[in-house]
């Protein structure tokens, strides 16, 4: 009943659902009544138009998830959920909130499904969208400079071990970074990837683990535990080239451009690992075990290079 019998010839009525209604009017005159009816079509209060994703979908970079709603959106709440690999991995980007957008930072490459729940009291409407997230590529051209790598190293406050490397072809950090670029470019690997991995593996060239500076092993090649010192190389360039070749082996099945100096390259070949990790994030659990965030940690250092 929109209005009980009243002297007022009008009233307000608030429909709660979309659809076709029949409205009945009774005009009462004592014991006599007259009647009218009218069909009223009520549209939806709001409509969920789309789930939009803005920004580059890259590992470690925030993207914006936005619910597009037309009509009266007052009182609505929005929940965003993501999953990858058939719910093998999933998470909540935003719990139910009045905000129709949120930021989500994917941590791994691959195809994700993003779920949007638009909540209106006890009612919900849903949308899904596939999002392909690109990782941090290992192969590629130089995207920074020797100066930028040197500046980052010096900003950390670490002292470059000149005494260790002066006889190995890299008396200064600038020489070291120049050799990184030379070795990396020769095999088509991004120099900043090599720099960042070397800094992560050696603690900014301070070492301290089973690998010693005079081994010129900047990526822990062959150092499978704390007791094993791993591979040994004649000079800094050879050690960096071995690291570059191991990265290339993981990233692509393409042949090496130089004579192989990586003692572990044949392991990648024999186990069918060539080309299984085109992105840094794919190295998780491969180069380092368990290494759940190994690639992300390298990418984080890359992001610090100016």
Label every PLM stretch briefly.
Residues 30, 70-74, 121:
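Short glycine/proline-centered coil/turn motifs in the loop regions
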Residues 2-7, 91-98:
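Short beta-strand segments within Ig-like beta-sandwich modules, predominantly Fibronectin type-III
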């Amino acid at each position: 009943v929109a209005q009980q019998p009243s002297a007022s010839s009008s009233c307000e009525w608030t429909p709660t659902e979309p659809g076709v209604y029949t409205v009945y009017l009774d005009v009462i005159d004592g014991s006599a009544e007259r009647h009218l009816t009218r069909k009223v079509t009520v549209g939806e209060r709001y409509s969920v138009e789309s789930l939009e994703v803005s920004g580059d979908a890259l590992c470690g970079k925030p993207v914006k998830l936005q619910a597009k709603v037309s009509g009266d959106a007052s009182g609505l709440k929005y929940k965003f959920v993501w999953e990858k690999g058939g719910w093998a991995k999933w998470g909540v980007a935003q719990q139910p909130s009045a905000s129709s957008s949120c930021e989500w930072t994917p941590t791994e490459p691959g195809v994700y499904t993003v779920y949007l729940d638009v909540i209106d009291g006890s009612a919900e409407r849903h949308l899904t969208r596939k999002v392909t997230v690109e990782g941090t590529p290992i192969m590629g051209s130089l995207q920074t400079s020797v100066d930028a790598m040197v500046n980052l190293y010096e900003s950390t406050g670490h002292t470059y071990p000149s005494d260790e490397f002066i006889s190995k072809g890299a008396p200064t950090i600038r020489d070291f970074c120049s050799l990184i670029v030379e070795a990396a470019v020769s095999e088509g690997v991004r120099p900043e990837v090599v720099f960042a991995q070397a800094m992560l593996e050696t603690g900014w060239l301070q070492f301290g683990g089973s690998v010693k500076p005079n081994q010129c092993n900047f990526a822990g090649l062959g150092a499978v535990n704390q007791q094993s010192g791993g591979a040994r190389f004649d000079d800094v360039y050879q050690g960096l080239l071995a690291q570059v070749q191991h990265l290339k082996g993981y990233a692509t099945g393409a042949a090496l451009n130089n004579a192989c100096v990586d003692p572990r390259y044949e392991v990648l070949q024999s186990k069918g690992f060539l080309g299984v990790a085109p992105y840094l994030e794919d190295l998780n659990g491969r180069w380092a075990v368990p290494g759940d965030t190994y690639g992300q940690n390298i990418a984080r250092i890359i992001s610090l290079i100016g």
